[in-house]
Amino acid sequence: MFIISGRTMLKKAQQEGYAVPAFNIHNLETLQVVVETAAELRSPLIVAGTPGTFSYAGVGNIVAIAAELAKSWNHPLAVHLDHHEKLADIKMKVAAGVRSVMIDGSHFPFADNIALVKSVVDYCHRYDVSVEAELGRLGGQEDDLIVDGKDALYTHPEQAREFVEKTGIDSLAIAIGTAHGLYTAEPKLDFERLTEIRQRVDVPLVLHGASGLPTRDITRAISLGICKVNVATELKIAFSGALKNYLTQHAEASDPRHYMIPAKAAMKEVVRKVIADCGCEGKL
């Protein structure tokens, strides 16, 4: 099997002190870039998609293409549901072959978040599907969900301990100062809070909103317990920017096989950098 659960790769990362990158993809070309680059660098890989991505491309198509690419490169990977909110939707995608899930109930009150997450864990663990959940809220935009900065909430360390114990999740996404989208100013990550969470929680910790973070912040976060790093916006900007530039310079261009090449090359450089920042080259 080339489509695997994220549980084992995150535990290995936790034990060996690096992080696994989770790259958000949208179509054939972006899938090709992340799988090919990870395979060339022998890096563990999580291919992530939001509900919007799976609606756009089709869950069966994403799983099938990811499986074929993984097989052709002899490179097992996890296909991951990013920021999913409904158990019925998760059940459908697990049935289609997904083996890694993030259930996001962070917008609910604490007790309701626990109840929702536990229902997903109880279902997914029957099928060896790993489950990530979020406690605290990141600012910014993910799919059609927009969280204003004033509504962003940092993860409370003691609540994190209770949350993990009561839900049985495999990994915990925490809020320590990152945000979805690009930063207008350099973010100030709360590393002290991260340390306090790590002291209370033994599951792998996840950092969302890593696009544009300085390498030093990613490296320090990993040294303090982050085991999975999510990148989305930075990939889209590199891909679309190179595509726009090519079409501006070649107004007559009409062949996707030509104008997708520079877009993929630009995105590949971001993937390579993130893998280097995560310290996971050669860790497959």
UniProtKB/Swiss-Prot annotation:
InterPro entries: Aldolase_TIM, Class_II_FBP_aldolase, FBA_II, TagBP_ald_KbaY/GatY, TagBP_aldolase_GatY. Pathway: Carbohydrate metabolism; D-tagatose 6-phosphate degradation; D-glyceraldehyde 3-phosphate and glycerone phosphate from D-tagatose 6-phosphate: step 2/2. It catalyses: D-tagatofuranose 1,6-bisphosphate = D-glyceraldehyde 3-phosphate + dihydroxyacetone phosphate. GO terms for molecular function: tagatose-bisphosphate aldolase activity; zinc ion binding. Binds 1 zinc ion per subunit. Keywords: Galactitol metabolism, Lyase, Metal-binding, Zinc. Dihydroxyacetone phosphate binds at residues 181, 209-211, 230-233. Its cofactor is Zn(2+). It is an enzyme of class 4 (lyase). Its EC number is 4.1.2.40. Zn(2+) binds at residues 83, 180, 208. GO terms for biological process: D-tagatose 6-phosphate catabolic process; galactitol catabolic process. CDD domains: TBP_aldolase_IIB. It comes from the Bacteria. The active site is at 82 (proton donor). SUPFAM superfamilies: Aldolase. Catalytic subunit of the tagatose-1,6-bisphosphate aldolase GatYZ, which catalyzes the reversible aldol condensation of dihydroxyacetone phosphate (DHAP or glycerone-phosphate) with glyceraldehyde 3-phosphate (G3P) to produce tagatose 1,6-bisphosphate (TBP). Requires GatZ subunit for full activity and stability. Is involved in the catabolism of galactitol. Forms a complex with GatZ. This is D-tagatose-1,6-bisphosphate aldolase subunit GatY. The lineage of its organism: Bacteria, Pseudomonadati, Pseudomonadota, Gammaproteobacteria, Enterobacterales. The gene is gatY.
